[in-house]
A protein has these predicted regions:
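Active-site acidic carboxylates
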Residues: 1-114
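Internal catalytic-core helix/loop-beta-alpha segment
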Residues: 101-150
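Short, hinge-like loop/turn segments at secondary-structure boundaries
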Residues: 83-87, 139, 166-167
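Short Gly/Thr/Asp-enriched flexible loops that form oxyanion-binding sites at enzyme active sites
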Residues: 158-168
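Glycine-rich phosphate-binding loop at the start of an alpha helix
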Residues: 133, 155, 159
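Short, well-ordered beta-to-alpha junction loops that form the rim of enzyme active sites
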Residues: 69-72, 123-124, 152
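Glycine-centered short loops/turns at secondary-structure junctions
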Residues: 61-64, 143, 169
Length: 169
């Protein structure tokens, strides 16, 4: 089957589909990141970085829009007003301040970083890439009706982002 035939059979209309990359930040997805001791084996075994990189390459070649939903980067005073904290927020407040603004751990992983012109949503502070961000407004403004969602961490930010997306108009 050639690519043109694949495009015609795709349930994802190119002009209305976006690849949403959630939390491709060094502390979460890169060797040497603070979450690597917990997630590194799985990331390597299932080739997470390689698969996301390949998907980015293909979607960019096809002209599919790419958007990013980054997690909040720690700054002095982060979460001072929150009554309840998620495990990631606790890790950000702990020693080393995971996902620190302006440090390697809070930067996008080099091979998964946004290209010029790709949308980077405002930072989400807990799990969903939609909660408290401008992501929904951007997707709506660009008439995006279909999402392909990849990134970190499946049972937290990916799941919450997908569940939120389904609930939106």
């Amino acid at each position: 089957m050639d690519n043109q035939e694949n495009d015609q059979k795709s349930p994802y209309p190119i002009g209305k589909t976006a690849l949403l990359v959630v939390d491709p930040l060094n502390d979460l997805i890169s060797e040497g990141g603070m979450a690597w001791p917990m997630a590194g084996t799985v990331i390597q075994d299932v080739k997470t970085v390689e698969h996301i990189h390949d998907l980015l390459k293909i979607t960019r070649e096809k002209g599919i829009k790419v958007a990013y939903a980054p997690h909040h980067r720690y700054r002095e005073g982060s979460y001072a007003e929150r009554k309840y904290l998620s495990p990631t927020q606790v890790a950000q407040l702990g020693p080393g301040h995971m996902l620190s603004q302006g440090k390697w751990g809070g930067d996008f992983a080099e091979t998964l970083a946004p290209k010029a012109g790709e949308f980077i949503a405002s930072e989400h502070s807990c799990s969903s890439g939609f909660a408290g961000t401008n992501l929904h407004a951007h997707l709506t403004e660009n008439e995006i009706t279909h999402l392909i969602v990849v990134g970190m961490i499946t049972n937290s930010c990916i799941e919450a982002t997908v569940r939120s997306a389904i609930d939106l108009d």
